[in-house]
């Protein structure tokens, strides 16, 4: 569905938030937009319609979970695999959570939905299912960012919670978003929240 939209507007503010929606008008009065930067893109025509401050270094916040989902989906783990939550997986998470407990059993698919919804405990369980340590998962995120040409992005965690040294730009977020929009598997997870 997202690919069928005429255009997508990503607004980045402080604190960082991003939104996507269909744009009904053909003109954008940019002087009326108050943000830390913005990017208006037409998927159908591969056309940048308006942009501002796309190279400015910003804190990525929840957009980090797009890359977390990227690494999770590119891991060689079947979505129907049952994952048993361990105490180790729940040691360090904080923030929004679904109250997972050691011993809980979920499919990898359910964890991916929970990640897209924004649950940090699901992000930790996924990270420690894909990799041996949280640091190894973050290293994969940074490697993928470099592979995609996201030269101004550094990930420090996979939840998006504030940590010193974590940074990105609107341009890099757009690069990742375009890459993920081409992944039908990712779009299936995201579509659930459009309904």
Residue ranges, per PLM feature:
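Short, Lys/Arg-rich N-terminal segment immediately upstream of the first membrane anchor
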Residues: 1-2, 51
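Sec-dependent N-terminal signal peptides of Gram-positive bacterial secreted proteins and lipoproteins
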Residues: 2-24
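Intrinsic disorder/low-structure terminal segments
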Residues: 15-20, 42, 185-188
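Active-site-adjacent loops and short helices of periplasmic peptidoglycan-processing enzymes
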Residues: 20-171, 180-181
């Amino acid at each position: 569905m997202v690919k069928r939209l005429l255009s997508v507007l990503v607004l980045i503010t402080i604190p960082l938030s991003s939104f996507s929606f269909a744009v009904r008008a053909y003109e954008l009065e940019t002087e009326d937009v108050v943000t830390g930067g913005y990017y208006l893109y037409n998927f159908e025509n591969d056309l940048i319609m308006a942009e501002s401050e796309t190279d400015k270094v910003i804190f990525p916040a929840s957009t980090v979970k797009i890359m977390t989902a990227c690494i999770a989906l590119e891991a060689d783990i079947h979505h129907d695999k049952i994952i048993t939550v361990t105490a180790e997986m729940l040691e360090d998470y904080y923030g929004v959570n679904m109250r997972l407990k050691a011993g809980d059993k979920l499919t990898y698919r359910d964890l991916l939905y929970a990640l897209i919804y924004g649950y940090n405990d699901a992000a930790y369980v996924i990270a420690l299912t894909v990799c041996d340590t949280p640091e190894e998962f973050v290293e994969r995120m940074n490697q993928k960012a470099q592979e995609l040409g996201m030269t101004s992005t550094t990930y420090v965690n996979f939840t998006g919670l504030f940590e010193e040294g974590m940074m990105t730009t609107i341009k890099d977020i757009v690069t990742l978003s375009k890459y993920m929009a081409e992944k039908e598997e990712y779009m299936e997870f995201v579509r659930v929240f459009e309904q």
